[in-house]
Amino acid sequence: MLDLKQIRENPTAIQNRLNQRGGGASYDLEPILAIAAEQKAKESERTVLQSRSNEIGKLIGQKIGQGADPKGEEIQTLREEGNSLKIQLADLEPQEKDLKEQLQKLLLELPNLPCETTPIGASEADNIEVKRWGDQYLKAETVGILPHWEIGEKLGIIDSERGVKVAQSRFISLMKAGAALERALINFMLERHIGVGYQEIMPPILVNSDSLLGTGQLPKFAEESFQCRGDDLWLIPTAEVPVTNLYRDEVLDLEQLPIKHCAYTPCFRREAGSYGRDTKGLIRLHQFNKVELVKLVKPEESAAEHQALVADAEAILQALELPYRVVELCTGDLGFGAAKCYDLEVWLPSANTYREISSCSNFHDFQARRANIRYKEKGKKGTQFVHTLNGSGLAIGRTMAAILENYYEPSSGQVKVPVVLQDFLKRDYL
């Protein structure tokens, strides 16, 4: 959520930065400014009325103490004025509440401001490739490389038909070595991240609306999430939601920062806007597994922590010897809550292209304002909002897809197991 004070003081600058997001969306600050002005006027009116009401109460007590007749005309006149003020104050209360709710609704619908260092652009075509790694692992010959779902079906480790039978489209069942590979990837990733200082969390995978509001999925993306009928509970789209919201409405000590968590969870998404895209395989499912990295940090350290987050996600791909590239997103391709974002894209030889496998975002204080996560420094007055960051470390299904394609040996029809996973799987080939 954006800072209302900033919007009031610098509306033109805020408007210009919002307009950088492009994508055909428009963000009108005028309704916010108008309601904020009306709310402020009501607050001022209430302050004046409350002050006069308090003054009358004291005045009545003083006059009676000085001998005035409690039933006399002077006291009765003051009491009538006091009663009138109470009625006016009571009338103001719902008006202020309504204005506050209107203002909150409009503020929650505004996306985050792009970071000043985020490249300006209109769409993903304007994103900037900042790094490419692993060219030595690219296959010299891609003839005979099958898409990962065909490899999985041939090996009997991906069963799409039964996944659809049990649920519906965009569900799969992992069988035998496929299930073992998924589990091995989860354990490998968690151990690597714990080894560099992340604390593991196993959070709820059902969360309430306040949690989704805090991290920015609600109200804008309600249709992309699965809600439990009859309960204020939603299946999580990412572990970012429960892990970040562990600290909702809390004031942390400065000494606790930075907080670094990793978490494995199943994730659930409707993929409402992807009809007809990636209908086969592991790339775009309604249910998938992911290891997530989440950080809560001091504002002045968030840029450096962001770079470290990207490096931690990269380390997994490097250990697996999977070719990838790092892309910096432009303003027109930023996610709703992100101020700055890097995507890691892994090489899929069957498609002869790179596909996103991790999105590492710095939200600045956008989520912290929504979730009310602050920190306090000893000896100093007041509190500050933390900066939040998160990224996949990594998406398990997409990692498996990349392994199946990059390690597939057409001559034997087998898939070599990456060296770092062989101890987990107790085998060299699938």
From Swiss-Prot:
One of its GO terms (molecular function) is serine-tRNA ligase activity. The keyword Protein biosynthesis applies. The keyword Aminoacyl-tRNA synthetase applies. ATP binds at R269, R270, E271, E356, I357, S358, S359. It is found in: Cytoplasm. CDD domains: SerRS_core (cd00770). GO terms for biological process: selenocysteine biosynthetic process; seryl-tRNA aminoacylation. It catalyses: tRNA(Ser) + L-serine + ATP = L-seryl-tRNA(Ser) + AMP + diphosphate + H(+); tRNA(Sec) + L-serine + ATP = L-seryl-tRNA(Sec) + AMP + diphosphate + H(+). Pathway: Aminoacyl-tRNA biosynthesis; selenocysteinyl-tRNA(Sec) biosynthesis; L-seryl-tRNA(Sec) from L-serine and tRNA(Sec): step 1/1. It comes from the Bacteria. Its main location: cytoplasm. GO terms for cellular component: cytoplasm. InterPro entries: aa-tRNA-synt_IIb, aa-tRNA-synth_II, aa-tRNA-synth_II/BPL/LPL, Ser-tRNA-ligase_type_1, Ser-tRNA-synth_1_N, SerRS_1_N_sf, SerRS_core, tRNA-bd_arm. Consists of two distinct domains, a catalytic core and a N-terminal extension that is involved in tRNA binding. Homodimer. The tRNA molecule binds across the dimer. Catalyzes the attachment of serine to tRNA(Ser). Is also able to aminoacylate tRNA(Sec) with serine, to form the misacylated tRNA L-seryl-tRNA(Sec), which will be further converted into selenocysteinyl-tRNA(Sec). Belongs to the class-II aminoacyl-tRNA synthetase family. Type-1 seryl-tRNA synthetase subfamily. This is Serine--tRNA ligase. It comes from Synechocystis sp. (strain ATCC 27184 / PCC 6803 / Kazusa). The gene is serS.
